[in-house]
């Protein structure tokens, strides 16, 4: 499972995933610290849309600061403002990534990311008689942590083994009607050929809600995963 629940939800809100727009970026040095930057403007509709459903635009920026290049430790800072159906929306986020080479066979990667923003999709799905007047009363907040351990085998066609276990916490309306979803996704991967030429993974996605709600998708469940990837 490549995408986190958080990434998927913020993609629906127009901040991540596939968006139509323009972006410029570059790099500079802050003393001895390398910094990458990017500034973007998108229509926030996502991909495969026939036309833009409103005149609003979403503006965002991202900074990536190289804290410890020897361990590939980077700090990412994200922020965005925009308008959706003439209502102001926002999103902010922070992430840390790192990679440590333990020895000639073992490597460890780690990612942690937290985001918060306006859940304007939820706001616009409610009638004016039951919602508040401010879209920013409807806020989504999430965090995930993903450690990954890799063992290089290089034995015949089997190149490496990977084990990861992602923990996620996501609450799509934490201010007014909190019902956080916690997800645990352990995965075991087998890589064949070089550079992920072929790989298959086995794992489980386990979802837990604070409150289970009948006749909705907000209920505890387990999903077995078998995934095959190949590059040509």
Where are these regions (language model features)?
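Transmembrane beta-strands of outer-membrane beta-barrel proteins
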Residues: 35-39, 73-77, 108-112, 145, ...
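Surface-exposed coil loops of outer-membrane beta-barrel proteins
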Residues: 1-64, 229
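Transmembrane beta-strands of outer-membrane beta-barrel pores
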Residues: 41-45, 79-83, 100, 114-120, ...
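Outer-membrane beta-barrel "beta-signal"
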Residues: 219-232
């Amino acid at each position: 499972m490549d995408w986190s629940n958080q990434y998927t939800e913020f993609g629906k809100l127009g901040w991540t995933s596939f968006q139509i727009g323009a972006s410029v970026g570059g790099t500079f040095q802050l003393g001895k610290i390398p910094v990458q930057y990017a500034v973007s403007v998108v229509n926030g509709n996502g991909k495969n849309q026939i036309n833009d459903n409103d005149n609003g635009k979403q503006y965002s920026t991202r900074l990536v600061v190289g804290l410890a290049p020897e361990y590939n430790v980077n700090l990412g800072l994200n922020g965005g403002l925009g308008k959706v159906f003439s209502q102001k929306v926002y999103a902010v986020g922070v992430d840390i990534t790192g990679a440590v080479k333990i020895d000639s066979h073992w490597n460890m990667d780690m990612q942690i990311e937290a985001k918060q923003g306006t859940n304007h999709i939820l706001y616009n799905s409610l009638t004016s008689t039951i919602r508040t007047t401010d879209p920013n009363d409807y806020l989504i907040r999430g965090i995930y942590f993903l450690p990954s351990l890799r063992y290089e085998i290089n034995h015949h066609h089997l190149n490496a083994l990977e084990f990861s276990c992602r923990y996620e916490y996501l609450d799509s309306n934490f201010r007014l009607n909190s019902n956080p979803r916690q997800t645990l996704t352990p995965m075991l991967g087998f890589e064949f050929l070089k550079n992920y030429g072929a790989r298959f993974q086995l794992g489980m996605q386990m979802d837990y809600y604070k409150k289970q709600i009948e006749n909705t998708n907000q209920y505890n469940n387990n999903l077995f995963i078998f995934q095959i990837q190949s590059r040509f």
